[in-house]
Amino acid sequence: MSGEDNLLKLVEVEGPDDQDYLLQEQVGFILRKAHQRHVSIFAAHIGDLTPPQFAALAKLRDVGETSQNQLGTLIAMDAATVKGVIDRLKARGLVELSKHEVDKRRLLVNLTAEGREAIERLIPLAREITAETLTPLSAKEAATFMRLLAKLA
């Protein structure tokens, strides 16, 4: 029986043993390993953007111009992180910033034409990345996994 099979048995049947603490059986460790695998697959397909940069472009594609803070909320990033992401995308000419017409303190972010072209080109690759990440799972397992992850998020 493989280590993965043992873990599944532990999770599905027995529950954790209070006497032992094995890192490889902890949810955070397993999530981190799965995340590392996904990021590696992402980098192999889209090497010139980070997943947070891609997320920002994809969300801007969906919602259009929005405030920097709202974009951060929409893509689950704190203000400092989203600012860094936007700064790097702006330096590459993929997004542009403007001041809000009424509240000049608010910065609005939007895709440039180059940013729109980039995200439209990358969306099919993102679908491939998701499919490759979920390859070890059957279609039913993948659907269950996504539903359970969404519940945890």
Identify the role of each PLM range:
Residues 1-48, 111:
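N-terminal leader segment of winged-helix/HTH proteins
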Residues 25-29, 36, 49-58, 69, ...:
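Short alpha-helical elements of helix-turn-helix
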Residues 32-35, 58-62, 123, 150:
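Short, locally clustered residues in the helix-turn-helix/winged-helix DNA-binding domain
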Residues 39, 65, 87-150:
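Charged, amphipathic alpha-helical coiled-coil/dimerization segments
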Residues 46-50, 81-84, 88, 138:
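Short glycine/proline-centered loop/turn elements that form peptide/ligand docking sites
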Residues 72:
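The alpha-helix within a helix-turn-helix
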